[in-house]
Amino acid sequence: MTTEEDMRSSSSESSPKSFLSLPYDVVFNCLSRVSRTHDPILSLVSKSFRSLLALPDLEAERFRILKNETCLYVCLNLNNNNNPNPSWFILSQTPKHKLIPLPSLPYPDPHPNCSTVVSTGSEIYLLGGFVAKEKRSRRAYVLDCKSHQWRRLPKMRIARKEAAANVIDGKINVYGGCSSEYHNSVNWGEIYDPMTQTWEPFPEGALNKEGVIPCALIKDGIAFPDCGLLISGKVYDTTTMDTLDYNTPMDKLDLCPNVCMLKIDNQDFQASVSDGKLKLVRCRGAMAWHWTVGGLEELSCNYLLSVASPGGGRRVTVWWKTYTKECKTEIWCALILLERELVWGVIEWSENVFTLPGSESDSDSNSFLLHYELVTLARH
């Protein structure tokens, strides 16, 4: 005769075991072999998972096993009623290429528009931008790419939007983006020191333009020599400035959307998306050669919105949207290898990386891929 105690015992034995019920060493060993790109999803499972993922010992073991791991982070304007604010993702490589959502900015802060992004080490900095009533913001945030958590930083000294930024000697240098009252003052730029967590103006008389490189500007297929500036891989239009020299504050920089720089065989190229197609431009002096990349017939039925070259070499990613009959929006990405003297592209992969409800159409390529950063988590 089966007793009630036997039934409870049998039921207990047949119920599925939790992963966390395994010996600690087994759990630790398994998690150490999982790519960091999956951490945002794993952290949602339970508080126990979040605690495990935050362990310094786990990070050390991952560095030992996985060594360097390079991850692409993107900020997209989904322009969807369910996602009205820009959203950050990490692009997972395995088993399929998928965008994994990252946590939002610290509540209740909305994501600013026209902000500036720059990365150093395992951190991504988000600076300034427009907030309520399109006012410039002094706010600054940093994303820890190990824990995938945002935290607030001390506010900048001056409110800015669409500023330029780069990293010099481990410090964040921010240029321009301020109102006209600061255009001719030392406050047109400032420096953030992560060690002291303080903002300081540029030293008087020192414009800190290391890493700011003059480059050609392409408009409607015409090259304008030295009318652009290359800062952290981004191209800025300086044609609205009165003069361009190293004694003039960069107070009127305009970011050129959907343009990325490629360094191939010691030559500079600009990749861009125009009329839904991937195009390349090579500049030499006042001359410019531009062409549409061939070999991409598989993508010809899609209207490309954005291009990014996180590595700066022969590979670029292109992005576009499709809309389904089920009123869903699919975000697609393809990795393209440029070959045959860069006139031909080979599609290494092309996948639907994210699907969201709603099909609010928006083909404005200038406002889709807002930011991207390639972050390498290196073993120290």
Swiss-Prot record:
Keyword Repeat: yes
InterPro entries recorded: F-box-like_dom_sf, F-box/kelch-repeat_ARATH, F-box_dom, Kelch-typ_b-propeller, Kelch_1
Stretches assigned to the F-box domain: 16-66
Keywords, comma-separated and alphabetical: Kelch repeat, Repeat
Kelch repeats: 123-170, 172-219
Gene3D superfamilies reported for this sequence: Kelch-type beta propeller (2.120.10.80)
Protein name: Putative F-box/kelch-repeat protein At2g44030
Taxonomy of the source species: Eukaryota, Viridiplantae, Streptophyta, Embryophyta, Tracheophyta
